[in-house]
C-alpha cells in the first residue's frame, strides 16, 4: 500500500507526513470573531511549525431546531473567507450542502467538505467532484469504515481523486458517539489521507433537547489517542467562549488552550512517525 500525497500549495497531506491541522470555528458567527480566531490559529501554528488550514461553516444546515443559528449564508460567508485568506495567507476548508453551492464555494476555498449526513448523496458527490477541488469526506456516523470505499469510488468515477477521509465518531446507541481507533487504521489501508475530527467526536447528538451536547473535558484524551495512530491530520474547532458559542460549544476547545493542546499533539505525531513500521500480520 502506498500513501497518497495531496498537495495544497506547500502543504503535503499524507498519512506518513507531519500532521496538518484543520482548525477554526464551527460556524461563522461574525466577521470580527472569525478574523480574531483565524489570527490566533495562524500565530500558534506558525510558532509550532504545524501546517494549517482554516475551517468554518457559512451554513449549518442540519441543526436540531429550526430556530437554531445557522450562519451568515453563502454569499456573506464567502466574503469573510476571502478576507481571511487575503489577510493571513491561509488555505481554507468549508462544507457544502447543496449542489448549487459547490462551484462558487470552490472558487474561494481550497478544500470542500462533504458532510457526514450527506455522504451518500450521489448528486452532491458528483457536483463536488466536478469542481476539481480537494474533497474532505466526513465518515457518516452510521457507516462502517470499510464502506468508505464506496464513496471513494463515486468520487473517482466522477473524475476526482483528491480525497481526504475524516473520522468523526460512530453511533453507539442513542445520543452517543464512540471512536473506533482500529476503524481509522482500516481507512488508512485505502492509502488516502485520514484525519480525525476530535471535537465533533465528543458530541452527544440531541443531548440537549434542541441541540447537541458534548464532552469538552475529554478533548485532550481523545485527540491524543487518535494522534497515536499516525494520521495525516487533526480536525478541531475552538472558541474564545465555548459556553456561549452559537453551535457545538459543548465540543469546542477553549481558544486560550490551543497552543498547549497543539504542542502535545505535535509531540505525539513526531514520536509515532519516527518509529519503524512493524508488520504483525506475518
UniProtKB/Swiss-Prot annotation:
Keywords in alphabetical order, please.
Answer: Cytoplasm, Lipopolysaccharide biosynthesis, Transferase
EC numbers on record: 2.5.1.55
Q: In which pathway does it act?
A: Carbohydrate biosynthesis; 3-deoxy-D-manno-octulosonate biosynthesis; 3-deoxy-D-manno-octulosonate from D-ribulose 5-phosphate: step 2/3; Bacterial outer membrane biogenesis; lipopolysaccharide biosynthesis
Domain of life according to the entry: Bacteria
The UniProt record lists the keyword Transferase? yes
An annotated GO BP: keto-3-deoxy-D-manno-octulosonic acid biosynthetic process
| InterPro entries in alphabetical order | Aldolase_TIM, DAHP1/KDSA, KDO8P_synthase
What NCBIfam families does UniProt report for this protein, alphabetically? KDO8P_synth, PRK05198.1, PRK12457.1
Spell out the protein name for this chain: 2-dehydro-3-deoxyphosphooctonate aldolase
